[in-house]
Amino acid sequence: MFKTRERLQWKDVRFLTKKRQVFSQGLLTIFYVEQYPNRKFHQFSFHIPLLVSKRAVVRHKVKRILINSLEKQISTLNFWWKYYKCYITLHKMKLQQLLEILDKKNSNQLISYLENENTKAFTSFCQFLWKKH
């Protein structure tokens, strides 16, 4: 779980979605903006839509897997020359494979699938930011 200062507040989420700087790769869609110059840390927030499951327990499980995966990657990602605010959500049009895995109720397969998608998305995001700056 992220520390409180590393989590986005709702006013930040609204700002990011209005700003419309978006990166989409595979299952994840990332809304991002550069962090304020006086803040030397990243801020992240995840949103799991109701299309995944109407049960909050299932959505929370997916969210925890993504958060843990991102925490593992943070030390190895290569976009630390600048700090960012990122709001991450699942791409609603690409949920079919995730829903099939959730129907099977195979926890290990779910974890490996989400970690793989998260890794691919954030390495592509880092490369995108590197080319941009």
Residue ranges and their predicted role:
Residues 1-133:
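Positively charged, solvent-exposed patches that mediate nucleic-acid binding
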